[in-house]
Amino acid sequence: VLELTMATVSGTDAGATAGMLMAEAPSEPGAIMRVGRDKAVCRLVTPDDWLFVSRVHLEFLCGPDNTWHLSWLQGSQPDPSSEVRLVVGEYAQTVPYGGSVPLPRGGAGEIIVQDRTGPRSVNVGFYHEG
């Protein structure tokens, strides 16, 4: 099972957890969860006016070996207006635009989508059962 929790944070709200959204999916090949502004295809939906987040920004896909992968999907713009980081404990990694990284099995961490133009972020915590 992959469990996700999402909080949208703006300026003075840093550290607040009000309005947290949750989603989970079984670790089965082909299972998928998405994060973005499009309510039709995303399990976790960000505010409509947060344009630094694409309609479908992040995708969590379970592969054939039951390992989850995080992808930052390429949007309609050639240059993104955000940056995405994967943080697991003391380890932090920038996720490339249009790129994919595996999530650690039996681990927990956070994916941070940071607005490049202001103090806003989408923080997605994850727990991947081992």
Task: Identify the residue ranges that each predicted region occupies.
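Residue-identity detector for glutamine
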Residues: 74-77, 93, 114
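Intrinsically disordered, low-complexity acidic Ser/Thr-rich regulatory segments
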Residues: 1-51, 61, 65, 95, ...
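Short hydrophobic/aromatic patches on the structural cores and recognition surfaces of FHA
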Residues: 35, 57-61, 66-87
